[in-house]
Amino acid sequence: MDSKIMNVLVDRVLELGPKVEDSGPYRNFKLTQDGDGIAWLLFDRAGASANTLSADVLEEFDLVVAALENQRPAGVVIRSAKPSGFIAGADVNEFRGATDARVVETSIGRAHAVIDRLEALRIPTVAVIHGFCLGGGLEVALACQSRIAISGARFGFPEVLLGLHPGLGGAARFTRLVNPMQAMTLMLTGKTIDARKAKSLGLVDAVTEERHVRNAVRDAVFGRLKRARPGILTSILNFAPVRGLLASRMRSEAAKTAPRENYPAPYALIDLWEKHCGDKAAMLAA
C-alpha cells in the first residue's frame, strides 16, 4: 500500500500509549506506564462523547495527580481518549440556576486548586492535544510544562461568550507565556485558533501527527523538545506602565460592542490583567 495512504490511516488512530487492560481504580481516567517510565494519563469521561470538567471529574483528577506525586514517573503525558478532542471545557450545566455565589466560588476554588496541583508536579508534564481544547481544557494544557498539538487541533477561551472569563488561572498563565496583547484578544473575543497559529504564538511547543506522538512525548519528557519561551516583548507588554496604557485601549475597544453595564466579564478580565499580571501568584489568587 502507498506510504502516503498508510500515513493517513495511521493518523486517524489516536496514539494512547500502552494498552490498558482494565479500567483500574478510576471512572473517568486510565493511568498506565510505558517502557520509558512515562505515565500515560488518558481522560475518558464515562458516559459522554466529549470530555468536560465536572465536579466529580475534577475530584477524581485530584486523586490522579496525588497518585502521580507518589509514583514519580519519568514524566506524564495527558491525553484525551475521545476522538472528538482534548477537553471541551467546564461542565457549565452544573452552574445553571445557581443562586448562591458562595457555592459557585467554592466550586471554582476547588477546581483551581486541582489545576495548581497539576502545575506544581515535580516531573515533566506534557499535554498532547487533538481536536478542540477549549476553556477549562486549555487551562489544563497551560498547567502542563509542554504542549504538543496534533494537526487540526483548535484552541480558545470561549468563556466571554457566556458572560465569564477564564477562572482557573488560565489568564495568568496565558498572558505570561505569549504576547499578552494576543492572549487578551483571544480571551476577550472568544475566538479559536488552529494548531499552527498556536505554535507561532508560543502556546504550543510542537505540531505533529499521530504517528509521531510517541517520539514527540519522549523528546518533551527527556528535554530534547525545544519549549516555547516568553520573548522580551511579552515582558515589556506585561510591565506595569505599559500594561496600564494597553488596558485603557482594551476597555475603549470593548466598549464599542459590549457596554460594561451589560457585559462585565471582559472588563473584569482587563482589570485582573492590569492589576495583577506583574505578580503571577497574586493573579492566580485574585
Predicted regions and their residues:
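A short, flexible beta-alpha/helix-coil linker loop
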Residues: R45-S49, E94-F95, K275-H276
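Glycine-rich phosphate-binding loop at the start of an alpha helix
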Residues: G89, E105-I108, H112, G135, ...
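A structural preference for short, pocket-lining loop segments at secondary-structure junctions
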Residues: D36-L42, L58-R102, A113-H130, I150-R154
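Crotonase-fold acyl-CoA enzyme core
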Residues: E119-T234
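Short amphipathic alpha-helical boundary/capping segments
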Residues: D116, F174-T175, A255-R260
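Amphipathic alpha-helical segments at domain termini/boundaries
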Residues: D2-L42, E139, L186-A286
